[in-house]
Amino acid sequence: MHTPKHAIRRMSKGEMEFFEGRCQRMGEAKRTMWGTKWCGSGNEAINYTDLGYFSNLDSCCRTHDHCDSIPAGETKYGLTNEGKYTMMNCKCESAFEKCLRDVRGILEGKAAAAVRKTYFDLYGNGCFNVKCPSGARSARSEECTNGMATYTGETGYGAWAINKLNG
């Protein structure tokens, strides 16, 4: 197959860098839901206070992104995450679901419902609960210094299938 000469044009280094950057940003944008900077895989935010058009929904996702978790392949609280996705603390999952349900507005409410349905019903990776033995809390922060976690199991068909097929 031949490319017609009229379709080929030399670009300056600056033009090329502009288009490369644009393509890279588009790739990132496809990982988050439209109108948000935090809802999806990764985030597009410049800093912690940077929220998208759907700021209430985005705030839910941002809080969830900064919650207690165990990344795929890592161990924390004596529990190894053998799945393909990050495993979240069940308290974080409950707070995230409540936050999504509390989002109001015609468009933003529908967007929050879509995130909730996708994340909990389809993705549904399950979560972990941490039990802290008595006397194992830090006096300063009330944080559990020697907790043990248990996994709840997948709740969504998508996570179950991916973890089983790739496991």
Curated annotation (Swiss-Prot):
Glycosylation: residue positions: 47
Main location (coarse class): secreted
Matching Gene3D superfamilies: Phospholipase A2 domain
Cofactor: Ca(2+)
Keywords (A to Z) from UniProt: Calcium, Calcium channel impairing toxin, Disulfide bond, Glycoprotein, Hydrolase, Ion channel impairing toxin, Lipid degradation, Lipid metabolism, Metal-binding, Neurotoxin, Ryanodine-sensitive calcium-release channel impairing toxin, Secreted, Signal, Toxin, Zymogen
Organism this protein belongs to: Hottentotta tamulus
CC cofactor note: Binds 1 Ca(2+) ion.
Enzyme Commission number(s) of this protein: 3.1.1.4
Protein origin, superkingdom: Eukaryota
Residues bound to Ca(2+): 38, 40, 42, 65
Protein family (similarity comment): Belongs to the phospholipase A2 family. Group III subfamily.
Record-linked PROSITE patterns: PA2_HIS
GO biological process, one term: arachidonate secretion
MF GO annotations: calcium channel regulator activity; metal ion binding; phospholipase A2 activity; toxin activity
pH behavior: Optimum pH is 8.0.
Protein name according to UniProt: Phospholipase A2
Catalytic activity: a 1,2-diacyl-sn-glycero-3-phosphocholine + H2O = a 1-acyl-sn-glycero-3-phosphocholine + a fatty acid + H(+)
Role: Phospholipase toxin, which catalyzes the calcium-dependent hydrolysis of the 2-acyl groups in 3-sn-phosphoglycerides. Inhibits both skeletal (RYR1) and cardiac (RYR2) ryanodine receptors (calcium release channels). Probably blocks ryanodine receptors by generating a lipid product. Shows hemolytic activity, but it is not know if it is direct or indirect.
Residue ranges annotated as propeptide in the record: 136-140
Subcellular location: Secreted
Subunit structure: Heterodimer composed of a large subunit and a small subunit; disulfide-linked.
Disulfide bridge map: 39-61, 60-99, 67-92, 90-127, 132-144
Tissues and organs where the protein is expressed, per its UniProt entry: Expressed by the venom gland.
Lineage: Eukaryota, Metazoa, Ecdysozoa, Arthropoda, Chelicerata
GO cellular component: extracellular region
PANTHER family: RH14732P (PTHR12253)
Active site: 64
